[in-house]
Structures are given as C-alpha cells and as structure tokens.
Amino acid sequence: MATSRIYSRTAGEIIEEALRDAKIIPAEQPVQAVDYENGLDSLNNVSKFWQTKGIHLWLQERAVLPLVTGQKVYELGPDGDPCGYEDGFYSTELDAAAVATDTTLTVDSTTGMVEAPDILTSSAVTSTQDWTSVNSGVLTVSSGIVITNSGANDGGADYSLDATVGVTYRVRFTYTKGTSAGCVFSVLNSSTVEDTVTLTASASGELTITAPVDTITFRARNTSSTSGETSTVAALNYVDEDSGSRIGIELDGGTMFWSYVLDVDSATSVEMSSAITGAAAIGNQVYSFVNQIDRPLKLFNATYASSITASEIPIDKWSRQEYTQQPDKTSQGTVVNWYYDPTLGDGKLYVWQTASDVTNVLRFDVRKALSVYSATSDELDFPDEYLMALKWSIAADLGPSYGVKDNRQIVLETKAAQALESALDNDNDLGSIYLAPNWSGG
C-alpha cells in the first residue's frame, strides 16, 4: 500500500475530532449543523489568537515592492501599492519603444506573465441550452450556435453572463458569416446596449462592459430579415480584464505605469487591459506578478536595491517614535530605514530616505495572517504538526459553551497548552548564535 508524508484535514474533520474528544458529542451521535457552526467560530477564534504566538514559518514569504520616487508611505495589502511575492515576481525590459495609447508591448520575455482567464468553465457554443432565442430566431448547433431567421424577422440569440457590479469585462467572440449579410453583436445591461459592433465578414470581435448589475447579456442578431438566413457564433469567451498579472512599465518621465495583462500573444508580446500614459524607450524596466500581497501582520529582514538586479543592502527597522522624530521625511536617496504600521486596513510602510529613482526596490519578509474558515470543507492552513494542538484548543474553547464540567475543562486546557508548546518548539528559524565579551563590565 502506498503511503504519504502529508496528513491533511478539513475544518469539519478537526471540529468533529474536537467535539468528540471533549465528550461534547458521543461517538455514536452525528454532528449537527449548529455544532459545526460553533466549531467554525471556535476554529477562527483559535487561529486568530495563535497569530500572536510566534514565528509561524509557513506563513512567511518574501515580497518585492517597487518604489516610487519621493514617496514616503506605501500601503501594503490587497488594495495597496503594487507589491508581489518574490517567487512570482518577474522582470524584463522593453524590446521596442512604446508611445502613449499603446496597449500592446514588445518585451524581451513574457515569462511568468499570466493572461486574464476565461470565466466560462465550459464551452458556450456546443449546446443551445443556455441560449435564449430573440425575435423568433431558431437556434441549432453546427460548429457553433447557428442563428436562423424564422419568417421575415432578424433573428437573434441571448446568452446571460454572471457579473460583479463595478467590474469591467471583455466579451470575446468568433463570428462565422452565413447567408445573412451580417450580424450585430452587443453586450447589454438589462435592455441598455453598453457596447456593440456589426460584422459583415467572418472575424473575431471583442466588447467591453463595466457591469452595473450582477447579470449582463451577450446578444448576436442577424442584420438580415429574410427567412432562413443564418449567422454562426463559433466561440464565446468572457474575462475580467483585471484578473491577469499586474504589469508595470517604466515610463520615460520617471514614473511607473501599472495595468493588467489581458493577453500573452507570444514569447515577446503582451497586451494590457489599459493603454500606457506616456512614452517608454527600449530597455525600460517591466515588472509583472500574479498575486498582490495580503496585509502583512509583520515585516522583517528588509533590504534595498537600486534596481531589481542590483545587490541588496540590509536596512534598519525604526520604531514609530524614531520615524516621527525624523525632521526631513521627504529627502531622496538610498533607503536606509523603515517603520511598519499594521493598521486594520492595508498596512502602512514608512521609508527614509525616499526613493531617488523609479527602478529602486525594497524586498522584505512578511508574516501573513491565518485563513478565515467559512465552510467545513475548507482545507486547514496549518502544517501537520499543529493538528493536535488545534484539535485540543478548539475543544477547550468550545467547552464552556457546552457546559463541560470544570475538571474536564482543566484537562482540555492543559492538553491544548502542552500541544501548542510542542508545536511552537518546532516552529522556529534556527540561526547563528554570537557570543561576545561584556566590555562594559556590568
């Protein structure tokens, strides 16, 4: 029999173990939904409390922050300044000059760049099931959705797309010309057309819409009203234009323009979701990364480099008082000090001095927050060696709510404390120890 070195548990499994070991739920009795809900609350309480308890090595990652000339404060988190995890952070250079309004760039390499994924999980053109006939159009399938006029009507077809209000989407399609003179393609907010194009020859097209509601409609409609004339929707794709890699381009004016990768056209060509706002010369820096960092609980091991490929220089951590007492917070030069304030929203990183060039970067280790669990099927965000401590800690946390007797509660709390201590003993970053004489004589 094959064996594994990984022992994984779901939230529901660890909650059930805790309930049974605490003698709250008998072995022969099924766990009820309300008990799972209580267990999820306890699991989240325990995991968030544990964030105060040590290093948690598995929650540490190295991050890269491109600096902005003269900027003294950076927001770190999902809605903060562009900042990615180092293992998914890529750099390249422009291989051809770009001008304002360009959306397609030629670069040395598109390695690591991820284009916006198709939201549709299955082909929309292999069945008429999710399509709705418009104006008596007859729908069939033959190398796509075939729209046939019924009588003297310009027949059409609608396809509903789930959306998030405020998000901008690209609806892409391939049209095969039939006997109809052409076809009108549109995206609609209810009955309001937000974007439209008419094609009279086989081609691919793209429509853009910023969703004002949670359902939008793609419509294809023949331009001809002659009975029996046809058009075919051969392909349909649907993307959130801001779901690809973040991409930053150094502009000649000394700033960094940020957008999202829409398409990776080739090994050296990339299309962005928005046009650059200024000129960029051959050799200018290009950054890309997939995952914006989460709000860090802590920062440490920070280094500064004059460029992404330059040598890193360790920089010193300041206290809040040391930063606030610095009289000239806007002076530019080499960054030598930093202070981090982990606010409840995006965290705030203060640097001194401020960057003197748009190619300057900081790197630092971040400690991420533990996951919040909302379903019993969620995989636990803990290494194997923490599962025992987690089980007993959940049991101890649930005990008072279920009226566990005092002597049993003491046992649960003792087991929880001992298991957590053992787990924390294993959760440390062993390094060098330096001994030096005490020259002060104290």
Predicted features along the sequence, with ranges:
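Glycine-enriched, solvent-exposed interface loops adjoining structured elements
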Residues: 1-99, 104-105, 110-117, 240-442
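Extracellular and organelle-lumenal recognition/adhesion modules and their flexible linkers in secreted
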Residues: 78-80, 88-91, 95, 104, ...
